[in-house]
């Protein structure tokens, strides 16, 4: 579950 967080952080 790191891609989802990265997606939200990146925007």
Curated annotation (Swiss-Prot):
Expressing tissues: Expressed by the venom gland.
Originating organism: Campsomeriella annulata
Localization, UniProt: Secreted
GO CC terms in record: extracellular region
Keywords per UniProt: Amidation, Secreted
Function description: Amphiphilic linear alpha-helical peptide that shows histamine releasing activity from mast cells. Also shows low hemolytic activity, but no antimicrobial activities against all bacteria tested (E.coli, S.aureus, and S.cerevisiae).
Stretches of the chain forming a coiled coil according to its record: none
Highest taxon in the source lineage: Eukaryota
The keyword Kinase belongs to this UniProt entry's keyword annotation: no
The keyword Plastid is assigned to this record: no
Modified residues (Glycine amide): 11
Similarity comment: family membership: Belongs to the bradykinin-related peptide family.
Full protein name: Annulatin
């Amino acid at each position: 579950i790191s891609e989802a967080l990265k997606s939200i952080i990146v925007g």
